[in-house]
């Protein structure tokens, strides 16, 4: 069970005093962790709780949200607190009244995502590892995108598959693909763009008509990987892609690389 005494103390330290008698209310949105709404003196707070082993995941999420919010081009939930107590961990975020997406919001999201992707770094990766869902994501920095993607994305997924019994033809095909990776980048050298990292349709919504993104798996990489994720499960309309393309046109060969990244 969450240590609500410790959570309330952490919220108070962050300027969100919990009134006497206030109790957390279970809410949706915690597919991996338990999710709660708690009223405080500064407004409602969204909380995720889990075992102490969840702390690294929660703290990486908090740092990811702060990184995405730093350029001030796209809205993300504000981070209030993150910590552990005993055998439990938590992260507290700004409560946002999320609603349905609209075509106009999709277009603005496309423009804003392109602006976010213009925030770049000198190397691919990030200063720490994180998770995509429950799957570990390794982000050791590299100045070589092909090498980074081969080792920390494609290669890592193949090793996970092998550990789960998927061997034989899948591994052989994966090995051939890894050898062919440079072909996809013969005339394309991506910048190390700030990425959401897990931008599927369930990780964005609207608040007061404005697009909001959340539940990131942040790192610096090829911006086309974020777009490939948006196409994997749907949830993004033509207005989104048209607006992105208008703000920052994609390079030749992006359709082939989209298949690679998916």
Regions found by a protein language model. Name each.
Residues 138-150, 155, 159, 188-194, ...:
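Active-site Asp-x-Gly
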Residues 257-262:
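Small/polar glycine-rich anion-binding or flexible loop at a beta-alpha turn
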